[in-house]
Amino acid sequence: MRFVRMGMFVTAVALGAGFAIAAPATTDSAARKELKRADLSGAPNMEVIASITELKPGDEFPRHLHHGVEAGYVVQGGMIQNPGQAPSMLATGAPIFNLRDAPHAGYKVIGPGNIILFTTHVVDKGKPLYDWVK
């Protein structure tokens, strides 16, 4: 068995999916680095995508949704601010879980350090990973 980072392994096992070798470039977000992508076993129209997103102070993470489930965790937390709200802490180690077609994010990173997110998406194949929400 190949060496797999513990976080990826736990997430993959929890979702019942294995990952492929290919890691194509992304065009949906400059902050997201795709790590692995594979078809979801037993579901021919779905795929599993593992990614790392790194957001720097001043970056905005636009409001968006996915055509499937997003699960993961905050590898490195930091201060964020949603429009019209007081700053809040996105805590290191916090879980990430967003249901199909549920709008989320829409915040600005206010620092002082970078925020790093590990995510696994189980989504409809052939659809964009992100649909931006106004």
Q: Where do the language-model regions lie?
A:
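A short, N-terminal "cap"/entry segment at the start of jelly-roll beta-barrel domains
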Residues: R2-I52, I96-F97, Y130-K134
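Extracytoplasmic low-complexity repetitive segments enriched in small/polar residues
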Residues: A38, L55-P57, M79-I80, P95, ...
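Short acidic-glycine-tyrosine-enriched beta hairpin
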Residues: L40-G42, L55-K56, G84-A102
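A short beta-loop-beta micro-motif enriched in histidine and acidic residues
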Residues: M46, G58-Y73
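Structural recognition of the beta-strand scaffold that forms the well-ordered cores
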Residues: R63, A71-Y73, P95-N98, L117-T119
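Short beta-strand His + acidic residue motifs that chelate non-heme Fe in jelly-roll/DSBH
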Residues: R63, Q81-N82, N98, H104-G111
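Glycine- and acidic-residue-biased ligand/ion/polar-headgroup-sensing regions
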Residues: H67-Q85, T92-A94
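Ligand-binding loop in jelly-roll beta-barrel domains
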Residues: A102-G126
